[in-house]
Design a protein with these regions (language model features):
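N-terminal amphipathic alpha-helix/helix-capping segment at the start of soluble metabolic enzymes
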Residues: 2-36, 94, 290-302
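Structural preference for beta-strand elements that scaffold enzyme active sites
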Residues: 33-37, 66-70, 106-108, 125-126, ...
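Glycine-rich, proline-tolerant flexible connector loops at the mouths of alpha/beta enzymes
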Residues: 36-49, 67-89, 256-266
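Glycine-rich anion/phosphate-binding loops
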Residues: 42-56, 87-94, 231-239
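Alpha-helix-loop-beta-strand connector modules within alpha/beta enzyme cores
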Residues: 54-58, 62-63, 82-108, 143-149, ...
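Active-site-adjacent loop and "lid" segments of alpha/beta metabolic enzymes
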Residues: 82-90, 128-133, 192-193, 217-246, ...
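Catalytic beta/alpha-barrel core
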Residues: 86-88, 102-116, 125-139, 148-160, ...
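Catalytic alpha/beta core domains of metabolic enzymes, predominantly
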Residues: 146-256
Length: 302
């Protein structure tokens, strides 16, 4: 019989990462209300981007939650040479800068090379390191030395405990503003799964933890015969989000699209824009319930 559970269990807590947005700051922490990292997979035609932004604005003016707009200027890691990649660095950053100033949303976008770090940091409020590149030391260094907050996705083949070394790598380059993102784990060929305990384990590192719901729903490499697009199961967006939010995390990362079947990239994983209001409302409700409970007591493995 355990007489003193505090001797075996520790309160689960995290540091805070403050995003200095164009109109207000957003504090990202596992103890704060959930933040939404929301938008398109890649910058598409302006009409598609505008439709997405208008609905995001409508939904979040109603629900009063913090939102960060995300979109890529270049999908550099597509499987096929036929896959659409986006507008590229110069045009893409110009469009993201317009979105930031016109809609007043903080911007999250990813980079793939060291040379992109400085120009991306001039526009983006959070720099994202893609999962496949999360161990690239030169890329981590270039991103860290911009002194911008970093959103680092856990590679699909890594164990959660391996992410501690990546946090330490960022810290060694002078950047302690790190958010770790779970985006699913490889489970055989063409399949990803979410292990909720991965989120709980990474919370021991005392940094904010996010869940990339959309890409955890992906079927890599099995979307079509030509392998131009990945498959996915976006109809499970809310159940998977619930699994992550129940762990008391800082943010959810969700891609949406007005017509997912016509999306340039990962349309099978994208939440239909028409479902955004419903999904956001239910995520907020569960997050409030979870964070209203006493601090979770989690055994630290020795």
């Amino acid at each position: 019989m355990i007489q003193n559970k505090e001797s075996l269990f520790i309160p689960d807590s995290s540091s805070e990462v403050v995003i200095q947005g164009p109109s207000k700051n957003i504090t990202i922490s596992n103890q704060h209300p959930i933040t939404f990292m929301l938008g398109l997979n890649v910058l598409e035609d302006e009409s598609v981007v505008e439709t997405c932004l208008e609905e995001i604005t409508r939904v979040f003016s109603k629900h009063k939650a913090s939102v960060i707009f995300k979109a890529s200027f270049d999908k550099a890691n597509r499987s096929s040479h036929q896959s659409r990649r986006g507008p590229g660095l110069q045009e893409g950053l110009s469009r993201l800068n317009y979105i930031r100033s016109h809609y007043q949303y903080p911007i999250l976008t990813d980079l793939h090379t060291e040379a992109q770090a400085a120009p991306v940091a001039e526009v983006a409020d959070i720099l994202q390191i893609p999962a496949f590149l999360c161990r690239q030391s030169d890329l981590i260094r270039a991103a860290a030395e911009t002194n911008k907050p970093l959103h680092i996705k856990k590679m699909q083949m890594l164990a959660p405990y391996e992410m501690k070394a990546i946090i330490e790598k960022c810290n060694s380059f002078g950047n302690e503003q790190v958010i770790l993102c779970e985006r699913g784990t490889s489970f055989g060929y063409g399949r990803l799964i979410l292990d909720p305990l991965s989120l709980a384990e990474m919370k021991h590192f005392t940094v904010p933890i996010s869940l990339d719901v959309s890409h955890a729903l992906q079927f890599p490499g099995v979307g079509d015969v030509q392998r131009v697009c990945a498959g996915g199961r976006s109809s499970y967006t809310l159940p998977l989000a619930y699994a992550g939010i129940s762990q008391g995390i800082s943010a959810v990362f969700i891609e949406c699209h007005p017509q997912p079947e016509q999306a340039w990239c990962d349309g099978a994983c994208a939440l239909p824009l028409s479902s955004l209001d419903y999904v956001v409302e239910h995520i907020i409700n569960l997050d409030r319930f979870i964070k209203a409970q006493p601090p979770t007591l989690v055994k630290r493995e020795t």
